């Protein structure tokens, strides 16, 4: 009798696994979705489908349809595939720059209302079309799904403190906070490869500016809790020149210009933003940085405490200059990704509205103080 029950149980397990396998083979698992602006106020939607078929190495494909609404597109997309499209594996949503500039709230809200989609999926913008991005292949693995590649691309840059958080949850939280705006990474195709090239700044749900790559660090250090950031910074030789290592003539590397470049890693940032007590709308930004020196374009006597002291002063001055330039550049766009309005609301006006902050923000000023500590130089004592 026991043998019969063992045989029956085994048979049921095999049958169940076969049924589950057949069910999966009938599904089109959406790993990425992209939205572009089409003619006649239509929206073009492209999805990447992963077809569950262990016998086919590269079983992903893209499907495109146009409609006025996200759900309308879903219906049309289902008409173009033999698989039942499901969103439970969605990892990335991409919005074309032109579409984003007109507002993407309705499209983002639809994702948040779908119970099968988690709120930790990544959102991003592209200055190409979303369709172009999603029709690219993973350059590291021809059989990989492009949706998975894009997810990993964004994930490692976010976790590496290169870009601010681009999750669906974070976008909606910032969208509804008074005195703070969303920001999303921008994907571009360069030399046939997809990569992050800038940061898209929003005013409410509308894209207003693409912040250049060299400014993203300064935005990130103020808008996120940086634990292990990286950056390359150019410093004027000036007072550092007397601390240069004097190599043998045959080893001397000629370097043009008056700039020395330093790569810093494992950057930890501790920031404090306060509203200055005066009639002027001035924010006091205090930033403490701990950095490690990884590489220099010109060798310095880093074993000498006087060199470290001088280098720290120069770093403080340059960080302050770059931060202030970035903040005023961002302010010109009318976007507030750092959240100065939130600081104002907490410290000055608890009844602040988004409309009122839009009136106040353009007149705001910034005073930055930076205190850098070099915790490691790479020098072996």
Q: How would you name each of these model-derived features?
A:
Residues 3-6, 13-381:
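Membrane-proximal alpha-helical signals and transmembrane carboxylates
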């Amino acid at each position: 009798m026991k043998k019969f029950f063992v045989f029956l149980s085994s048979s049921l397990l095999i049958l169940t696994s076969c049924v589950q396998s057949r069910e999966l083979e009938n599904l089109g698992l959406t790993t990425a979705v992209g939205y572009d602006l089409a003619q006649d106020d239509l929206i073009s939607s492209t999805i990447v489908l992963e077809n569950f078929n262990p016998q086919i190495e590269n079983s992903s494909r893209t499907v495109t349809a146009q409609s006025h609404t996200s759900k309308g597109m879903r219906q049309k997309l289902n008409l173009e595939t033999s698989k039942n499209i499901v969103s439970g594996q969605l990892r990335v949503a991409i919005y074309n720059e032109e579409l984003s500039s007109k507002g993407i709230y309705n499209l983002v809200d639809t994702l948040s209302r779908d119970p099968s989609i988690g709120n930790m999926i990544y959102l991003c913008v592209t200055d190409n079309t979303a369709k172009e991005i999603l029709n690219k292949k993973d350059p590291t693995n021809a059989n990989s799904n492009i949706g998975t590649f894009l997810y990993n691309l964004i994930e490692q840059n976010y976790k590496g403190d290169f870009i601010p958080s681009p999750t669906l949850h974070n976008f909606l939280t910032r969208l509804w906070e008074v005195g703070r705006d969303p920001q999303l990474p921008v994907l571009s195709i360069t030399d046939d490869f997809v990569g992050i090239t800038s940061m898209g700044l929003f005013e409410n749900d509308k894209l207003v500016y693409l912040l250049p790559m060299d400014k993203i660090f300064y935005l990130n250090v103020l808008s996120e809790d940086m634990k292990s950031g990286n950056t390359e910074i150019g410093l004027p030789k000036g007072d550092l020149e007397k601390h240069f290592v004097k190599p043998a003539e045959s080893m001397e590397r000629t370097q043009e210009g008056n700039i020395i470049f330093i790569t810093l890693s494992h950057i930890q940032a501790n920031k404090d933003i306060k509203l200055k007590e005066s009639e002027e709308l001035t924010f006091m930004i205090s930033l403490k940085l701990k950095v490690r020196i990884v590489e220099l374009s010109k060798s310095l006597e880093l074993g000498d405490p006087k060199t470290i002291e001088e280098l720290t002063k120069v770093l403080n001055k340059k960080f302050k200059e770059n931060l202030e330039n970035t903040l005023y550049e961002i302010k010109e766009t009318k976007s507030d990704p750092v959240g100065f309005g939130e600081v104002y609301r907490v410290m000055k006006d608890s009844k602040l509205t988004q409309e009122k902050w839009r009136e106040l923000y353009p007149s705001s000023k910034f005073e930055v103080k930076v205190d850098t500590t070099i915790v490691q130089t790479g020098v072996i004592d």
